[in-house]
Design a protein with these regions (language model features):
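Single conserved hydrophobic/aromatic residue that forms the stacking wall/gate
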Residues: 1-13
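Glycine-rich phosphate/adenylate-binding loop
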Residues: 14, 20-159
Length: 159
């Protein structure tokens, strides 16, 4: 069920996650889940990208899938790993299409599915994602009731 076009537009345009660090991704997820607002997650690193959409009551949230942010230095920063600019264009365009589909109420959203893209192989895959009924934010008995401020190294693009 898609809300009216005007309410859908205000929901989607304010909640597109293309951030470059896990604390921000979890903060966006948690804030949207608490507010009952949909959002789209996207991430890239090197030649790979991923995308999923969360709609309240229609599938898993980001935390259902990824549980908690990784330890502070467990995942390389953008500077360490590298980001291919064209990947932002590919995944960003797909994320924009998710917003358009939501707004106009057409097509199948990536709710309950993670779309992955491997640019080196030119392959897309869709992974079915179940809702975690034990999820700390959207599960049957949530344990997170306020936003958490995680700390992690930011993607330093200026040095």
């Amino acid at each position: 069920s898609t809300p009216s076009n005007s309410s859908a537009a205000s929901d989607v345009y304010k909640r597109q996650d293309g951030t470059d660090n896990f604390p921000a991704k979890f903060l966006i997820n948690d804030a949207c889940v608490m507010a009952g607002k949909p959002f789209s997650h996207a991430g890239i690193i090197r030649f790979k990208g991923q995308l999923m959409t969360y709609v309240p009551g229609e599938g898993p949230c980001y935390r259902c899938v990824f549980k908690n942010p990784p330890p502070k230095d467990a995942v390389p920063t953008c500077k360490q790993a590298g980001v291919i600019g064209a990947m932002g264009g590919v995944i960003g365009s797909l994320q924009a299409m998710e917003a358009i589909k939501y707004i106009i109420g057409k097509g199948d959203l990536l709710t309950g599915r993670l779309l992955t893209y491997d640019a080196l192989k030119m392959e897309f895959h869709t992974i079915k994602l179940p809702k975690d009924h034990h999820c700390a934010i959207c599960g049957d008995n949530p344990t997170i009731h306020e936003l958490i401020d995680y700390e992690q190294a930011e993607c330093d693009m200026h040095k």
